[in-house]
A protein has these predicted regions:
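N-terminal cap/lid segment of alpha/beta-hydrolase-fold proteins
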Residues: 44, 50-130
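Short amphipathic alpha-helix adjacent to the substrate-entry channel of hydrolases
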Residues: 124, 148-167, 297-298
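Short beta-strand element of the alpha/beta-hydrolase
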Residues: 131-140
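Catalytic nucleophile-loop/oxyanion-hole region of alpha/beta-hydrolase
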Residues: 147-148, 154-155, 169-203, 337-340
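Primarily recognizes the serine-hydrolase "nucleophile elbow" in alpha/beta-hydrolase
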Residues: 186-273, 370-371
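Short beta-strand/loop motif that positions the catalytic acidic residue
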Residues: 279-281
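Conserved alpha/beta-hydrolase "acid-adjacent" motif
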Residues: 286-295
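C-terminal catalytic histidine-bearing segment of alpha/beta-hydrolase fold enzymes
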Residues: 301-412
Length: 412
């Protein structure tokens, strides 16, 4: 018995010694292999995020700023601007949005008007499917309404299947007294900053955030590709919680667009770090919009901006146009009576995958690498090669986004 007790005590001492030695080994290995942990970047405080669906329903004027309801269940709605922002019309901030409901699908919101507290509605991808990419959707509607059904809500499940997070933008409209070129474009750029600021919370890669606009919504996504520096300089007050967060989109989608900044030969400066663009439109059947699409493409091509791709389809019309059988051309994801124009979204996915946006979060994209390589080349007019890059200008922003100024995404 005494021998057994002695053996047991010796075994316990041996196990304790082994555990202690292993702990020392792990600590020593970690100290040798890694650098001391780097402190997380400090940013101004952001307001807490609301819970999904914990929002008031549309109703009469309130005694507080109106907050819109989600278009789809589970969406997190976040106002773009803090209360009291000088960019808001405070005398109208309490007015409720007006939702036009679908006649075919009960409970579906087809379009929205009376937007005075612009917002984003965030739909994230769960688990290992999440690529960290995020697409902000700017619906069309001629600046008189916001067609969030076909040109926003329908894309949430589509992009989810590819691991892409979807953000629905509710921007201010001309019919409600706002300027599309100023207020609506500001809303788009502010949305990019807001998503980038909350990248960690939403498990979004801050280097994979872009905007896709449809028709009038493309009048937001196309200028966002060249005006981000100006917006960031204008909105850099120390009291702004988003000050220092870049509004540069990492990519833009320009879908059957309205007039772009290059309409009728206009030549505004193009930053040399302008983002990649995917452009699509019907051709002769939507001639004016196709010309606007081509003007953007030609300007970026002449400036030498990498990875600008355009698809013009021979058969098709603009959404809402009357067809020969009396029906109307549909928008968004619909197959458009099975014509090739009805599959443009798969060409976008091909382009998106090729540029590396469907990789896991934290991996540098091909798009980012090629922009960096482009920036290393001599700018036009430097006398060191290059040339033909009309309008391309040096940009003071980070070459490929604002990762150093935003939180690193958490692992999904």
């Amino acid at each position: 018995m005494r021998i057994c007790n002695l053996l047991n005590r010796n075994r316990i001492k041996h196990w304790i010694t082994q555990i202690f030695a292993l702990a020392l080994l792990v600590a020593a290995t970690s100290a040798q292999d890694g650098q001391p942990p780097v402190a997380a970047p400090v940013r101004p405080p952001l307001p807490p995020l609301p819970a999904p669906m914990a929002l008031p329903k549309p109703g009469p004027t309130n005694d507080a700023p109106y907050v819109p309801q989600p278009i789809l269940p589970g969406g997190v709605v976040v106002p773009l601007y803090p209360p009291g922002s000088p960019l808001l019309k405070m005398e109208r901030i309490r007015e409720a949005e007006q939702y036009n409901m679908s006649q075919a699908v009960p409970g579906r919101i087809s379009s929205i008007v009376n937007i005075h507290n612009p917002s984003i509605e965030v739909h994230t991808v769960d688990g290992g499917l999440n690529t960290g990419a995020a697409i902000i959707l700017a619906a069309g509607g001629g600046h008189n309404t916001l067609n969030v059904g076909g040109e926003s809500a329908d894309f949430v499940p589509f992009f989810y299947n590819y691991g892409v997070n979807t953000i629905i933008l509710r921007n201010r409209l001309r019919r409600d007294g706002y300027s599309p070129k100023i207020d609506a474009v500001n809303d788009a750029l502010q949305a990019i900053r807001l998503v980038r600021a909350y990248a960690r919370e939403w498990r979004i890669d801050p280097n994979k955030i872009g905007i896709m606009g449809f028709s009038a919504g493309a009048e937001l996504s196309s200028p966002a590709a060249i005006l981000f520096d100006e917006f960031d300089r204008t909105n850099s007050a120390p009291a702004d919680p988003l000050s220092g967060v870049s509004s540069r989109p990492d990519f833009v989608g320009i879908i059957y667009p309205g007039p772009t900044p290059f309409v009728r030969g206009a030549s505004p400066p193009i930053p040399r770090n302008a983002p990649p663009a995917f452009i699509t439109c019907a051709g002769a059947g939507d001639r004016v919009h196709a010309i606007w699409a081509n003007e953007y493409f030609a300007a970026m091509l002449q400036a030498g901006i990498p990875n600008v791709e355009m698809h013009i389809y021979g058969n098709g019309r603009h959404p809402g146009d009357t067809l020969s059988d009396g029906s109307r051309m549909t928008s968004g994801l619909t197959d458009r009576n099975a014509i090739p124009f009805g599959t443009w979204q798969y060409r976008f996915i091909d382009w998106f995958r090729d540029l590396g946006f469907l990789q896991k979060p934290g991996i540098e994209t091909k798009a980012s690498k090629e922009i960096t390589a482009f920036l290393s080349q001599p700018p036009p007019g430097s006398g060191r090669g290059g040339g033909g890059n009309r309008g391309a200008t040096n940009s003071q922003a980070n070459p490929v986004g604002a990762a150093p100024k935003a939180a690193t995404p958490a692992n999904p």
